[in-house]
């Protein structure tokens, strides 16, 4: 809706469904890569909501209702602002059952589904706001965005923040083209993100695997190292931030042929951002250090 020539309002809403589930564990300290599997059909028959109501699970499809609204405003001929708010209401989400205690067999038929199924139903919400400022004039381009997000989940027993709940995120991008035919381009990008949730390690213990023999002597067996986890996702990882710089020089051979040389510097101030944490060895692995690189391309 064009309120004026400089002010616009926009909104959208929809109901979405999918039949995929992430193939990763929220017990990992850091999750940067995701695989996806088809969602399972063997789910609990009922789901207890956060307010205590019990509803039937009619099918395995995951569903969410999305609502987005925002305004765009042209502050000047070269500077514009975009502000959006959103709400995602996750009505039914499939997740691994971290509360499982029993096998899903006839022996435990009287136990509740929430304690024996491999997967459970969850619900939750994600809401937040995005503010974007964009400046374009001649060969200058500046782009700044701030995002605030809050995500929670309810698994039938407790409310918690999932591992992708990042409260604050900032992106700053700048580029400038100069020289004959704008043959030179320089660019910079800085990103800041507050820490993701993770579950702390509370303790370790030796897990003895019994073989079913009543004469089994557990005192002479070799135990496996097992972990006692702390409260679900009540820890927060360190903040993430990184600066990347780049320069591009192009040579136009004719209308259809261009040679480009790219020089870049990743993580320019050598920030130590966490990549992985080994709970057992209590060792941290960081992401890329300061990394220079170059590339040469030919386009025709």
Task: Name each model-derived stretch.
Residues 191-224, 236-244, 248-300:
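C-terminal beta-signal and adjacent terminal beta-strands/loops
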Residues 86-89, 101, 106-197:
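Gram-negative outer-membrane beta-barrel transporters
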Residues 63-67, 123-127, 164-170, 239-243, ...:
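Residues that define the transmembrane beta-barrel architecture of outer-membrane proteins
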């Amino acid at each position: 809706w064009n309120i004026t020539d400089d002010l616009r309002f926009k909104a959208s809403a929809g109901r979405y469904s999918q039949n995929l589930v992430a193939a990763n564990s929220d017990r990992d300290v850091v999750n940067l890569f995701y695989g996806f599997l088809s969602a399972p059909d063997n789910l609990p028959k009922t789901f207890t909501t956060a307010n205590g109501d019990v509803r039937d699970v009619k099918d395995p499809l995951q569903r969410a209702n999305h609502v987005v609204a925002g305004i765009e405003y042209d502050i000047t001929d070269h500077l514009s602002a975009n502000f959006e708010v959103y709400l995602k209401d996750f009505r039914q989400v499939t997740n691994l059952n971290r509360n499982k205690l029993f096998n899903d067999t006839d022996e435990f038929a009287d136990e509740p589904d929430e304690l024996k199924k491999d997967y459970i139903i969850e619900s939750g919400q994600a809401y937040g706001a995005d503010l974007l400022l964009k400046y374009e004039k001649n060969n200058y381009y500046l782009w700044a965005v701030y995002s605030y997000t809050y995500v929670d989940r309810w698994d039938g027993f407790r409310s918690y923040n999932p591992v992708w709940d990042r409260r604050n995120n900032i992106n700053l991008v700048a580029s400038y083209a100069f020289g004959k035919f704008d043959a030179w381009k320089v660019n910079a990008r800085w990103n800041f993100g507050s820490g993701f949730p993770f579950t702390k390690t509370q303790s370790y213990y030796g897990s003895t695997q019994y073989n079913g023999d009543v004469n089994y002597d557990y005192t002479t067996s070799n135990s496996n190292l097992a972990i006692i986890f702390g409260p679900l996702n009540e820890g927060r990882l360190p903040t993430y931030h990184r600066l990347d710089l780049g320069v591009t020089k192009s040579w136009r051979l004719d209308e259809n042929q261009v040679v480009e040389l790219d020089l870049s510097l990743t993580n320019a101030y050598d920030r130590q951002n966490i990549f992985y944490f080994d709970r057992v060895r209590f060792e941290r692995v960081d992401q890329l250090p300061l990394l220079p690189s170059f590339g040469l391309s030919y386009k025709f």
